[in-house]
From Swiss-Prot:
Ca(2+) 3 binds at residues 93, 95, 97, 104. Pfam families: EF-hand_7 (PF13499). Ca(2+) 2 binds at residues 56, 58, 60, 62, 67. GO terms for molecular function: calcium ion binding. It comes from the Eukaryota. Residues 7-42, 43-78, 80-115, 117-149 form the EF-hand domain. Keywords: Acetylation, Calcium, Metal-binding, Repeat. Belongs to the calmodulin family. This is Squidulin.
């Protein structure tokens, strides 16, 4: 497996535990179906079997933790914090102009949260991140806001 950071390994373990509903260390097709359903997908039995077959290297019909880690490692690849930060910024910067406006922030927050934020709360979030005072958040300001102090 590729070298994974401790954070990535913890994330993989959390994901595995979410799939492994009964906690027996294996993901069955039934457990996979439950998780897929919670994600709004309804795969057929054949699709579920195919998903498991792609990952199930020992051929026992279930996905063990080691197989899950191997699959996730292939998908994750090496982490590039700069690239991840740029991708996160792009999620907010809907029109791609390099600035996050209050309208863009409101749109993203509406998608990610059930709580409806007031215009005042959105404006406050922008103000907190907006170092140069132009009423928008540029990439450098976004990085400062997202980086733990």
């Amino acid at each position: 497996a590729k070298e994974l950071s401790e954070k990535q390994i913890a994330e993989i373990k959390d994901a595995f535990d979410m799939f492994d509903i009964d906690g027996d260390g294996q993901i069955t097709s039934k457990e996979l179906r439950s998780v897929m359903k919670s994600l709004g997908r309804t795969p057929s039995d054949a699709e579920l079997e195919e998903m498991i077959r792609e990952v199930d290297t020992d051929g026992n019909g279930t996905i063990e933790y080691a197989e899950f880690v191997e699959m996730m490692a292939k998908q994750m690849g090496p982490t590039d914090p700069e690239k991840e930060m740029r991708e996160a910024f792009r999620v907010f910067d809907k029109d791609g102009n390099g600035l996050i406006t209050a309208a863009e922030l409101r749109q993203v927050m509406a998608n990610f949260s059930d709580e409806k934020l007031t215009s005042e709360e959105i404006s406050e979030m922008i103000r907190e991140a907006d170092i140069d005072g132009d009423g928008m958040v540029n990439y450098e300001e976004f990085v400062k806001m997202m980086t733990p102090k």
